Amino acid sequence: MKRLILIIIVCCRALGWCHANTQTETDSLYRVAQSLPHDSTRLEMFKRLAQIEQLTPRCITFSGLLREEATLQKNDRYNTIAAYLHTVYYYNQNNRDSVKKWLDTMEPYARKSQTWDLYFDALRFQIDLCTYEEQYELAINEANLMYERAQKVNCARGLIGAKQCLGNVYISTERWDEGMKALEAAYQLSLQTDNAVVRISILCQLISITKDQKNNQLLSEYLAKLKETLHHHTSTNPMLKEAFYDVYLFCEVYYTYYYLYAGQPEQAHKNLVKAGKFLNGNTFFLYRVLYYDAYAAYFRACKAYDRALAKIDSTIILLQEDFNSNYIHQKLTKADLLAEAGRSAEAIPLYIETLHLKDSIETTVLDKQMQQIKAKYNIDKVALEEERLKSYIQLGTLIVVVIILIILVAFMLRIS
């Protein structure tokens, strides 16, 4: 579930901007906004409206109103925020081109207002979408460039985000040690800031890795840190608790795995029941996938194969629109369950079908990576040739200057 986790983590970053989403509240606040004077209170109200609606198309409407008002008031900071909210919406739609468009719009405003935190958060959305689309080489290159840019403007959030992006790529390509190293570096950097949402997102990434590696000791440590950070943040900001329901669900789901690995299925079931309490109409579908997947693991541990298969089928239905590695992983898990249940006649054709699909996707991914490497090589080669040409021009200019100086010296000597 590596690529699935990736999308969940970045959504976690956007949660700091989220509030309870009710149509009544939105309509009420919009009426208030229309009566406000053209000052910072009006800007704040449009920002809040866009935050509330960030998962719906109305986010674009309110972000657009915020942008118009910020332009009218010549406020670069709120223009940055308006562009950022556009990137949040389009990120949730997996629309990398639109994220890029609004990043380009955001940059000059971020530079003028020095709101680099938001800019680098949005840049991270773009890079993580590259990883989600399996453009790994591009994501690595962009993450390294992001780190360099963040260093130049001394932006801690940018440094953290770049390390997280690298961690995501390494997780997705099963380079576990490099992924852990990058994310640990990000976590240590996050301790130097007061941004709890950033720490929560990093801890979720570390939890996903330690779960995949079945390192129960580290899984327990990171879960405890996540629980503490989440509790402190929502206690300090009680209005945000509902906005963090998906993260609470995430925490309980991964406690389920901790207890399953520890051989305590009864306790694991208690955590699943707790997780279910955080499901609602606004639950992002990938969190539902995580929830059903954990339930399948629980039923599998109890050898209740029919119930486990039903849960796996639920995840396959949710993921079937995009035949990616998550979809394949779930199909293979279903084949494993059928085999364990003694239904080999059903398992074997499913193994064959899924492995063919896996080979096809891996070949496509490999081709993408090779094209990216070749493209980077050609770009680097062109840049090298340009540098060589510049060197030749500079050398030629220097030779001409030296010749002129020699002629001048000779002329002066002749005169004297």
Language-model segments: residues:
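Amphipathic alpha-helical segments of tetratricopeptide repeats
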Residues: R31, R67-T71, D104-R111, N144-Q151, ...
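Hydrophobic positions within repeat-based interaction scaffolds
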Residues: T24-D39, I60, D97, D306, ...
